[in-house]
Amino acid sequence: MYGFNIGKAENAGLHLDNKKSENNNSSNNELHKVINTINNGFQFKDDDDEDNENNLNNESSSDEENQQQQNNNNNNNKNQFEDDDEDQEEEEYISGDDLNNNGQESDDYEEEEEDDDEDEEEEDEESKKLNYDSFFGANMSHNMDFLNSQNINSQIGLMDPHLHSSQLNFEEPQEEIELPAHACAYCATHELSTVVKCMHPSCGKWFCNGKGKTKSSHIITHLVKSKHKEVALHPESSFGDTTLECFNCGCKNIFLLGFITARTESVVVLLCRDPCASGPSKEVNWDMSSWQPLINGGEKAFCSWLVKTPSQVDSERSRQITIQQILRLEEFWKMDPEATLLDIEAPRSDDEKPASTQLAYKDAYEYREIISPLIELEAKHEKELRESLSQSGISIEWSQGINKRYTATFPFSRSDLEFKVVPGDELKLQFISSTGGVIEWEDTGRVIHIDDENLLSLETKSRCSFDSGPKGSYRMEMVWRSTSSERILSAMKSFAIKEQALSSYLYHALLGHPDIPPAPLDIQLPTNFHLKNLPRLNESQISAVNKVLTAPLSLIQGPPGTGKTVISSFIIHHLVKYVKGNDKVLVCTPSNVAIDQLTGKLHEIGLKVVRLSSKLREEVASPVEHLTLHKQVYKLDQMGDGELGKLRKLKEAFGSLSNEDEKRYIYLRRMMEMAILRKADVICATCVGAGDPRLSQFRFPHILIDESTQASEPECLIPLMMGAKQVILVGDHRQLGPVLLCKKVVDAGLSQSLFERLISLGHHPERLTIQYRMHPSLTEFPSNTSYEGQLVSELSHTDRDSQSKFPWPQPKDPMFFFNCTGSEEISSSGTSFINTTEASICEKIVTKFLELGSLPGQIGIITPYEGQRAYITSHMQKSGKLNLELYKSIEVASVDSFQGREKDYIILSCVRSNDYQGIGFLQDPRRLNVALTRARFGLIILGNAKVLSKDPLWNSLISHFKNKNVLVEGSLANLKQSPVILQKPKKLYGQGKLPIPGQNSNSFNYDREHIDPNIGMNMVYGISNNNINNNSNNINNNNNNNINNNINNNNNQRFNTQDGRYSNSQTSSSSQTYYGSTNSSGNTINSNQNQFFNTPSSYSANTGSSYQYRFQQYQQLQQPQPQQQQQPQQQQQPQQQQQPQQPQQQQPQQQKQYQQQQQQQQQQQQQQQQQQQQQKQQPHQQYQSQKQQQQQQYQQPQQYQQQNQQYHQSQLPPKQYHNQRFNNNNNNNINNNNNNNNNNNNNNNNNNNNNNINNNNSKNQNQNQSPRRSPVVGTLQLHCKFDSQPNNNKHISDPNQPQISNPNMSIPLSQSLSFNDLSQEQFNKSNSRKD
């Protein structure tokens, strides 16, 4: 048993040995009494106090020792830390190709993170309760020997409240026993077979293989967080003092090591994964196919045969350290290797949470006060991460170019770094002497090239002269530059103090002030929508162009393949044509790749464009290098023989100039740069590059930011402070967003882009809806899950028929999900994951494509994990049977790197395959949306269907593939449908609604037309694709019921059902709500008052009751009932509607329930029994028997119509609650609606039907001036009375009519009522309302 006092330094504590009692059997009953006594608050009293005192005196020494141990244990448990909820995982963010050259790619190891927002006081109280229970529960129930080791009578006497405290000796101190040196540095477990030593030179600490309260074992957690990779076992363990290393090559990277068994010998051989275990072996007795990693990727722990897991008892007795404390302890160890848990509990200034971002701000000063600390915190965090990354023991080959600069070429591993190194980055090289470790030489250079074999070329001004030094004596470190943060902070300062930085409207719009109306710009709209080298714009693009050109602030949402680059180029061309004077257009994107692509397109349509690059990227190859500013300066310099050319030649010849010549050279170069910029029509730069001092002399009233959703809001602020008067943001917030490294900054809300915040403020984005990239079958799922079914394909199946002979399971649907069951493993860096099974299948698929004639450039491989990317690249080149150069030409990249790009065929490797650890950031719907929309002709997904299906979104995707018969397994030559049974996903939001990528709780509901592709709706939402208006008309023709008349009157009531879906068999409960609340005589109440409650589009995956059952329920409500029987009906009606699903199966259960109540409720229950039996009939049969009766019943007396009309006119709500279209037409609408109700009751009369149509048309004419309403699935209209105060709503009820049993519900007219916001009980109540 282990007990610890964490208030002591260096894992000090108490080691309590168990002493077996000689009389365990005889003392069991007494032991249970003692435990019960403790649980009852120490109220136990023995009958023989005198004997207990004698026993206490006789066993004084034993009792003192036991009591002291108990006191120390209590003190220890009081200092234990609370075990918070560990379900949250820390999502690691991966950047794209570059984000100001500071992107992160390879640290994608999901480590659990505790909630930082937990209340400290509540945590302390919960911790005390946990510690109390831990001692009296775990310490006594799990280790009974602690009590049995003492005389049980002395224990009873110890608990006697009559004993004097002096006899117990509670305060007598006892010397503490130090823990052994091999105790776990986290939890202090020190069982020899369960601990491992970290062999990093700066560490040397011991850690156990237990998890405690974390998801990874303590040794794995330490290795990952500290980036250490070498371990050794304890000298007294079963395997001795062994440093784990590869038997062949001596590799000590524990994340690469695994084991195999010899066929003829009873031995286990340790081999590294690559290259020893992946290549052929010379040892014939080794079974290379049996290789398994030493670290179980799913469990994140060492194999139990090598390092045992602490027992449950030992785990419960150990220090209960949380992941937050571990992370802080690792940070302290970087500064002080001897730091303890006591040190991390000291308050620190950086523990305070920064202020969260807001939707709107009072002024620019408040904006700056909130955002600036977040920028500084992100910069500090990035600086610490970059400067902590390094690689030692590298070998360098030196060369010298014609520019007199030196180039150092050396291999490096991308997966070993947390950041993606790209050309233009700065690195520092150091030469470490072989004796003493002294730095004898260092220099900083910039990366100029990285090839596919991970050979990096670094250009420096000098080279190391210590050629005699041994190989592997060089060290590489990353260099952090503050340029980005400095420019962002400068832009925020300008936003606050410079009035001329941007227009007044944009100032207030960015702050979220709604009072300033936009003033339309005087720009002539285009008449010709076709430009040279650009395709003709489609309807959605033309509509977006016309609205954007005259607006000072506009948003364009471009889903994948909809032509964002095309429309951006057209808008820029038109702005250049109509800008006044010397004004120029500034075009920005957050990444260099995106801005290069847009620069090339602008050059193709004939614009004078200049690409402004940073100084660090001037020597980096670019597809638009001829358009860059420094290359244009170089060309002009070569064409002439001026002073600048002479100085440049001198600098190239001698490597440097004198101080005077250098100043003159810089001045002449700057003057030429200004001349080129003045002649340009468009200047292109990254968002951070827009803050370049060379642009400070220019003003840019027209600014377009492409891919704006990938930039943080402060990053977009840099170009806007250049005199902006018109801003156009282009992007898609349902794809990947900004990349931030600091979790505190992300939690504070800075990860929300400016594009998203403006949508939340009510700015309506213009969505492009026609895509030109993907095969129609590939468009289906992304359209329905991310874009509400609006994304339609302009291409047909024949347009995307590649004529390939690849064995697709369904040739008409070129896609399939290949079910892989291989386990995931931790990558060589320890910060990522790999899946060797998926990599092997990927190589076979690539080989098949190449054999069938596909080119390497047509194939792209996407994986979310850097470790898998590196392993697939290496595995294809080693295992592929075709030419090596073919595999080298195939691009393997992360999801983030592929955003904005496309390939003919995409292979997606999901990697994650475990039972307990989850799927990490694969569950991000935006990342999945990007991965699924990169392919033009075919898509292949490799993953574990059973594991992935636990996530709701992935479950929908795999179900979609399964419904199309493309969920397969087996060999490529014989693919067959997989029989895998999908897991039941966790229900989201309590409504079964799929998440909308990039949309949060305050997302804006777009007012747009709905384009229904009529595909995939059954799979995604569990509802059919039939239009609600068509179904309503069909139902009205068949049943002629008043509820159908309400649906038939949708033109009168102006229902917006663009997004509506309806099903006769199984639909969601939210889509089956009555389209109008009715009174007992069958008239539509809300049509008299013209109150409309539009609800946002919503779908539900839960199946609900059929229309047939709702129709029966409605008919039951309309049956004439005696007044004395109203009360029983009120009691039973809510029960009847509690479970509308599967109505035909529930009838026998309800019938049994009514039969049991029949004995107690005689005549009243007998009548209800008959009504229940009538519901079993089909709607048309019931209609045939009750048609005449219903027609008479639904006839409303003319007197009541007049009274009702007068009453409604006298009780109209205030003007501010009315829509403008109702102000002048209330009386006409009431008369028309009354005529409609009368005409609909005589459905067989053609004249009345014609009158009804005329009335509909007249009402539509009266409403022609009404604004558009947002699309809804169905409109739930409630008949309510509204006073001047919204809180004083009163429901109107007619005293002459019988009341419905369910309570009435009233809501303000200005509110939107969403079906997804209703609980099941409220939904049932709304269905049965009666006025």
Swiss-Prot record:
A Pfam cross-reference name: AAA_11
Keywords of the record: ATP-binding, Coiled coil, Cytoplasm, Helicase, Hydrolase, Metal-binding, Nonsense-mediated mRNA decay, Nucleotide-binding, Phosphoprotein, Repeat, Zinc, Zinc-finger
Acidic residues composition bias: residue spans: 82-95, 105-125
[ST]-Q motif 1, short sequence motif: residues: 1174-1175
PTM field: Phosphorylated probably by smg1.
Annotated stretches, region: C3H: 184-218
UniProt cross-references to SUPFAM superfamilies, sorted A to Z: P-loop containing nucleoside triphosphate hydrolases
Superkingdom, taxonomy of origin: Eukaryota
Enzyme class: hydrolase
Chief location bin: cytoplasm
Localisation per UniProt entry: Cytoplasm
Protein name: Regulator of nonsense transcripts 1
Lineage: Eukaryota, Amoebozoa, Evosea, Eumycetozoa, Dictyostelia
